[in-house]
Design a protein with these regions (language model features):
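N-terminal auxiliary "cap/dimerization" subdomain that precedes the catalytic jelly-roll/cupin core
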Residues: 1-51
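Sequence-level motif detector for i,i+2 pairs with an aromatic at +2
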Residues: 1-3, 11-14, 50, 66-68, ...
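A basic- and aromatic-enriched beta-loop-alpha substructure that forms the phosphate/nucleotide-
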Residues: 34, 38-76
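Secondary-structure boundary elements
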Residues: 35-51, 81-82, 102-104, 150, ...
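Structured loops at beta-to-helix junctions and adjacent beta-edge loops in soluble globular domains
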Residues: 56-58, 74-76, 113-116, 160, ...
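Catalytic core of non-heme Fe(II) oxygenases with the double-stranded beta-helix
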Residues: 65-155, 189-192
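Catalytic core of Fe(II)/2-oxoglutarate
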Residues: 137-203
């Protein structure tokens, strides 16, 4: 589950969401993300494949999880993918009858890391019977903290789209840095995904 450890660059408020890039090639991301070049060059599933990069450097208030308002229950426990009625695996998922813009292959994998000790819990499990949007906070009793691995600062977890993980409320106001790399196997895009001006053929 834990495959390596990274050093985060200086905090500047950098953000991008599911931006396509070429795995293992930092030259495929715009200049504003180059401070992550060492991480992007060394952390990949298959070098040369398309991957999807999320960087979220943002202020988090004490007592709240990084996932924030997206969590529907007292614990921000979730899977990366949602499962829609057609039996397909979706990003986001939404509500019954809503449009699904992004589908995921079942074998999609994700790297997760952040700069704050103990702010992310991961369970060595596969919860395929997930919800439309991946929020499984109502099943928190199935995933007690004593069975979780709490990531240390900079630790990189390699997880699947159905690996239960949770954003833990922070103890003090802090600038948190989070990085997620999603492997190839993502089909479609949401309007709020960050476009990559270097890889215009993907938009």
């Amino acid at each position: 589950m834990i495959i390596s450890k990274i050093n985060f660059p200086e905090y500047t408020g950098t953000r991008c969401l599911m931006m396509p890039y070429i795995q293992g090639d930092s030259s495929s991301v715009p200049e504003e993300y180059q401070k992550y070049s060492n991480i992007l060059d060394s952390l990949y599933f298959k070098k040369g494949d398309i991957g999807y990069l999320t960087i979220d450097e943002s202020a988090v208030k004490a007592g709240t999880p990084h996932r924030g308002a997206r969590a529907k229950h007292s614990r921000a426990l979730h899977t990366e993918a949602g499962k829609i009625p057609e039996g397909l695996y979706a990003w986001g998922g939404g509500t019954w009858g809503s449009n699904v813009n992004v589908l995921l292959d079942k074998d999609v994998e994700i790297f997760l890391a952040n700069n704050l000790e103990g702010s992310c819990a991961v369970w060595n499990a596969c919860h395929e019977d997930t919800t439309l949007d991946g929020d499984i906070g109502h099943l928190a009793h199935v995933y007690p903290y004593e069975n979780a691995r709490f990531l240390k600062a900079g630790e990189v977890a390699r997880v699947g789209i159905f690996t239960p993980h949770e954003s833990i409320p922070v103890k003090e106001d802090i600038n948190r840095q989070f990085i997620r790399i999603v492997s190839s196997g993502v089909h479609g895009r949401e309007p709020y995904f960050t476009k990559n001006p270097i890889l215009t053929f993907l938009h």
